[in-house]
């Protein structure tokens, strides 16, 4: 499982080197938009080394994390060293991947090999992926962070409830577009002291992505409000309730 407080979470919410690279010398695309998972890697090469790397990803949180990690891995490498990067190194750079998510690292690796092959005038044929074992049947449960997130800076003067309500709504709205692109969504249910209750739907309600979503949201809220916050998932979605807000 992805570490909700570690590398994958950081790479997902704060992706490195995301966006187009106009001066790219080598471009590799792997995956398919039709199936909802694709990554494009762009490299600027100078004196036989990767001077700059950027990526575009269409798909889930793991595609974004792997693309981000790969650009960091290859920047500064000579072409031989870049070719030698493995899917396992990409997995390690994101803090590990569960078996069903390992194809994200394989796609990022394929995009790298395709880009280098095109630059060098070669043809790269991606190996057939190994079949992913079917996970054992288990009831789906929502995962909540085990502890409050501490803010980077604690506010000397607490915010008024109405101002907190506005900021909480803004933070949640800011993450919804990315979650919707990943096939899920999050909505605010209630704010009760340090507890922020939310309702997850779609892909975000499964146990793998729920931890990633809730952990990142909790940290953002704590930093924004300047006080410890705990985000708790709710099975049902009642009317929004914010204690003290008018």
From Swiss-Prot:
Keyword DNA-binding in annotation: no
Keywords for the protein's UniProt record, in alphabetical order: Nitrogen fixation
A biological process from GO: iron-sulfur cluster assembly
Xref: InterPro entries: FSCA_dom_sf, NIF_FeS_clus_asmbl_NifU_C, NIF_FeS_clus_asmbl_NifU_N
UniProt xrefs under Pfam families: NifU, NifU_N
Record carries keyword Cytoplasm: no
Top-level taxon in the UniProt lineage: Bacteria
Molecular function (Gene Ontology), one example: iron ion binding
Homology family: Belongs to the NifU family.
Described function: May be involved in the formation or repair of [Fe-S] clusters present in iron-sulfur proteins.
Protein name stated in the entry: Nitrogen fixation protein NifU
The species this protein was found in: Cereibacter sphaeroides (Rhodobacter sphaeroides)
Biological classification of the source: Bacteria, Pseudomonadati, Pseudomonadota, Alphaproteobacteria, Rhodobacterales
């Amino acid at each position: 499982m992805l570490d909700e407080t570690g590398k994958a979470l950081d790479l997902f919410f704060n992706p490195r080197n995301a966006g187009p690279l106009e001066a790219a010398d080598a471009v590799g695309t792997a995956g398919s938009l039709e199936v909802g998972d694709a990554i494009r890697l762009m490299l600027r090469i100078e004196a036989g080394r990767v001077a700059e790397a950027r990526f575009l990803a269409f798909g889930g949180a793991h595609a974004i994390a792997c693309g981000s990690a790969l650009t960091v891995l290859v920047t500064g490498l000579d072409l031989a060293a870049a070719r030698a990067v493995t899917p396992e190194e990409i997995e390690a750079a994101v803090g590990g991947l569960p078996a069903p998510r390992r194809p994200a690292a394989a796609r990022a690796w394929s995009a790298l090999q395709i880009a280098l092959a095109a630059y060098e005038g070669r043809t790269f044929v991606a190996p057939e992926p190994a079949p992913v074992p079917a996970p054992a049947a288990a009831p789906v449960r929502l995962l909540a962070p085990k502890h409050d997130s501490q803010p980077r800076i604690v506010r000397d003067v607490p915010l008024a409830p109405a101002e907190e309500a506005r900021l909480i709504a803004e933070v949640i709205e800011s993450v919804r577009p990315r979650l919707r692109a990943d096939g899920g969504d999050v909505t605010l249910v209630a704010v009760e002291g340090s507890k922020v209750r939310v309702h997850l739907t779609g892909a975000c309600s499964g146990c793998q992505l729920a931890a990633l979503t809730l952990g990142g949201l909790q940290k953002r809220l704590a930093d924004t409000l300047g006080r410890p916050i705990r985000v708790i998932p709710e099975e049902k979605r009642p009317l929004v309730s914010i204690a003290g807000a008018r």
